[in-house]
């Protein structure tokens, strides 16, 4: 999904995070999201709290990319707000047209680390890398590509340690292209997973 798509999973849908949370687990999503944010495609105000985010899907905490590393906006979202938001440099995002005066990989290859971006990955330039989509602003909130893993992974142990103090934990970690579910595999967890699978079967009535 593009970085400006509304949240694909709707708040009224029953999620795996809902299932674990109802069983007393603390839940968190860390890393790549790629399933949309906000309640209107192209209508997100990245300078304010998003009206629809992972807190509406059963997650107690989230620290995520709005989409993926190759798409704008190139910022992390923490609990529905841009992390390290810089009010002196407001964020604007578009997947239809560029902003006046902003360089792109297609028109300004001399500004890139890689002088030959692929078609589609030749739009706004952030950190010397051209992306899918157009954006301007961001300031201190923009991630550093070489530090993405180091920026995300510290939240994993802190989330787990905080959760263990109160209950078990479900944490979804997506550093790039993979998803890892982290929790103790006990009989109760196995039962929860089977219950969730049943809610997703074609003959299921949902909650």
Please identify what each model-predicted range represents.
Residues 1-207:
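Formylglycine-dependent sulfatase
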